[in-house]
Protein backbone atom coordinates (compact mmCIF):
# COMPACT_ATOMS: atom_id res chain seq x y z
CA UNK A 1 0.00 0.00 0.00
CA UNK A 2 1.35 3.41 -0.96
CA UNK A 3 0.93 5.84 1.94
CA UNK A 4 1.18 9.55 1.16
CA UNK A 5 3.65 11.58 3.19
CA UNK A 6 2.03 14.26 5.32
CA UNK A 7 4.10 17.01 3.68
CA UNK A 8 2.69 16.05 0.26
CA UNK A 9 -0.90 16.48 1.45
CA UNK A 10 -0.71 20.09 2.69
CA UNK A 11 -2.29 23.08 0.98
CA UNK A 12 -1.15 26.31 2.67
CA UNK A 13 -4.12 28.70 2.68
CA UNK A 14 -2.03 31.23 4.66
CA UNK A 15 0.46 31.11 7.56
CA UNK A 16 -2.36 30.49 10.06
CA UNK A 17 -4.46 27.99 8.09
CA UNK A 18 -3.36 24.88 6.25
CA UNK A 19 -5.68 22.32 4.67
CA UNK A 20 -5.45 18.75 3.40
CA UNK A 21 -5.27 18.35 -0.35
CA UNK A 22 -6.52 14.76 -0.47
CA UNK A 23 -8.58 12.29 1.52
CA UNK A 24 -8.12 10.08 3.48
CA UNK A 25 -5.97 12.08 5.88
CA UNK A 26 -3.63 10.38 8.30
CA UNK A 27 -1.53 12.13 10.93
CA UNK A 28 0.94 10.65 13.37
CA UNK A 29 2.59 12.15 16.42
CA UNK A 30 5.51 13.48 14.34
CA UNK A 31 3.11 15.26 11.96
CA UNK A 32 1.24 16.91 14.83
CA UNK A 33 4.55 17.93 16.40
CA UNK A 34 5.63 19.44 13.05
CA UNK A 35 2.40 21.47 12.89
CA UNK A 36 2.85 22.62 16.49
CA UNK A 37 6.44 23.68 15.73
CA UNK A 38 5.23 25.67 12.72
CA UNK A 39 2.89 27.63 15.00
CA UNK A 40 5.54 28.22 17.67
CA UNK A 41 8.41 29.00 15.29
CA UNK A 42 6.29 31.57 13.44
CA UNK A 43 4.93 33.18 16.64
CA UNK A 44 1.36 32.35 15.64
CA UNK A 45 -1.17 32.87 18.40
CA UNK A 46 -3.42 30.31 16.71
CA UNK A 47 -2.87 27.86 13.91
CA UNK A 48 -5.41 25.59 12.25
CA UNK A 49 -4.92 22.47 10.14
CA UNK A 50 -8.15 21.49 8.34
CA UNK A 51 -8.47 17.78 7.68
CA UNK A 52 -11.32 18.24 5.20
CA UNK A 53 -10.29 19.08 1.65
CA UNK A 54 -13.00 21.68 1.10
CA UNK A 55 -14.83 24.15 3.36
CA UNK A 56 -18.07 23.11 1.65
CA UNK A 57 -17.79 19.57 3.04
CA UNK A 58 -20.62 18.58 5.40
CA UNK A 59 -18.14 17.80 8.16
CA UNK A 60 -15.42 20.26 9.18
CA UNK A 61 -12.47 18.72 11.07
CA UNK A 62 -9.77 21.04 12.37
CA UNK A 63 -6.70 20.54 14.53
CA UNK A 64 -6.31 23.81 16.41
CA UNK A 65 -3.03 24.88 17.99
CA UNK A 66 -2.82 27.61 20.63
CA UNK A 67 0.80 28.61 21.18
CA UNK A 68 0.16 30.27 24.55
CA UNK A 69 -2.72 30.89 26.98
CA UNK A 70 -5.51 32.94 25.37
CA UNK A 71 -9.25 33.47 25.14
CA UNK A 72 -11.41 33.09 22.04
CA UNK A 73 -14.37 35.44 22.49
CA UNK A 74 -18.02 34.43 22.63
CA UNK A 75 -19.25 32.99 19.36
CA UNK A 76 -21.92 30.71 17.90
CA UNK A 77 -23.31 29.57 14.56
CA UNK A 78 -27.08 30.20 14.58
CA UNK A 79 -27.60 27.93 11.56
CA UNK A 80 -27.50 24.97 13.94
CA UNK A 81 -25.79 21.60 13.97
CA UNK A 82 -23.25 20.28 16.46
CA UNK A 83 -19.64 21.04 17.35
CA UNK A 84 -17.31 18.62 19.14
CA UNK A 85 -14.04 19.43 20.93
CA UNK A 86 -11.40 16.89 21.96
CA UNK A 87 -8.21 17.95 23.78
CA UNK A 88 -5.02 16.31 22.51
CA UNK A 89 -2.55 18.39 24.53
CA UNK A 90 -2.93 20.90 27.34
CA UNK A 91 -5.97 22.24 29.17
CA UNK A 92 -8.82 24.45 27.95
CA UNK A 93 -12.11 25.66 29.36
CA UNK A 94 -15.21 25.66 27.17
CA UNK A 95 -17.60 28.21 28.69
CA UNK A 96 -21.22 27.98 27.55
CA UNK A 97 -23.87 30.68 27.87
CA UNK A 98 -27.43 29.40 27.94
CA UNK A 99 -29.80 30.25 30.79
CA UNK A 100 -26.71 30.48 32.97
CA UNK A 101 -22.98 30.34 32.36
CA UNK A 102 -21.39 26.89 32.69
CA UNK A 103 -17.69 26.10 32.55
CA UNK A 104 -16.48 22.74 31.26
CA UNK A 105 -12.83 21.97 31.96
CA UNK A 106 -11.22 19.85 29.25
CA UNK A 107 -7.72 18.41 29.33
CA UNK A 108 -5.52 15.76 27.79
CA UNK A 109 -5.00 12.38 29.48
CA UNK A 110 -2.03 13.66 31.55
CA UNK A 111 -4.48 15.60 33.73
CA UNK A 112 -5.68 12.59 35.69
CA UNK A 113 -7.73 14.77 38.04
CA UNK A 114 -11.40 13.83 37.75
CA UNK A 115 -12.36 17.51 37.42
CA UNK A 116 -11.38 17.37 33.76
CA UNK A 117 -13.11 15.80 30.78
CA UNK A 118 -11.29 15.32 27.50
CA UNK A 119 -14.19 16.05 25.13
CA UNK A 120 -17.50 17.88 24.79
CA UNK A 121 -20.23 17.94 22.14
CA UNK A 122 -22.55 20.98 22.04
CA UNK A 123 -25.12 22.59 19.74
CA UNK A 124 -23.48 25.15 17.43
CA UNK A 125 -26.19 27.72 18.21
CA UNK A 126 -25.06 27.95 21.87
CA UNK A 127 -22.68 30.81 22.63
CA UNK A 128 -19.30 29.49 23.71
CA UNK A 129 -15.96 30.91 24.73
CA UNK A 130 -12.70 28.96 24.63
CA UNK A 131 -10.02 29.70 27.22
CA UNK A 132 -6.59 28.07 26.89
CA UNK A 133 -5.09 27.63 30.36
CA UNK A 134 -1.88 25.74 29.60
CA UNK A 135 1.32 27.04 27.99
CA UNK A 136 0.19 25.50 24.72
CA UNK A 137 -2.82 23.47 23.67
CA UNK A 138 -3.84 21.29 20.78
CA UNK A 139 -7.45 20.31 20.28
CA UNK A 140 -9.63 18.79 17.62
CA UNK A 141 -12.77 20.66 16.60
CA UNK A 142 -15.31 18.75 14.51
CA UNK A 143 -18.34 20.64 13.28
CA UNK A 144 -21.34 19.66 11.20
CA UNK A 145 -22.11 21.62 8.06
CA UNK A 146 -19.99 23.60 5.66
CA UNK A 147 -17.85 26.49 6.91
CA UNK A 148 -18.18 30.17 6.09
CA UNK A 149 -16.73 32.90 8.33
CA UNK A 150 -19.94 34.87 7.84
CA UNK A 151 -21.97 32.10 9.59
CA UNK A 152 -20.25 32.84 12.92
CA UNK A 153 -21.70 35.48 15.25
CA UNK A 154 -19.12 37.05 17.59
CA UNK A 155 -19.65 38.96 20.85
CA UNK A 156 -17.05 40.59 23.06
CA UNK A 157 -19.24 40.21 26.13
CA UNK A 158 -22.42 38.38 27.10
CA UNK A 159 -23.58 41.32 29.24
CA UNK A 160 -26.87 42.80 28.09
Cite the ranges covered by each PLM segment.
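Short, solvent-exposed secondary-structure boundary motifs
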Residues: 39-43, 53, 74-76, 118-121
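A short, N-terminal "cap"/entry segment at the start of jelly-roll beta-barrel domains
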Residues: 1-59, 105-112
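Conserved hydrophobic/aromatic beta-strand scaffold that supports enzyme active sites
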Residues: 61-65, 84, 119-121
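A short beta-loop-beta micro-motif enriched in histidine and acidic residues
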Residues: 51-60, 70-86, 115
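Glycine- and acidic-residue-biased ligand/ion/polar-headgroup-sensing regions
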Residues: 67-68, 79-100
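Short beta-strand His + acidic residue motifs that chelate non-heme Fe in jelly-roll/DSBH
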Residues: 73-75, 94-96, 120-122, 128-133, ...
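Double-stranded beta-helix
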Residues: 99-115, 129-160
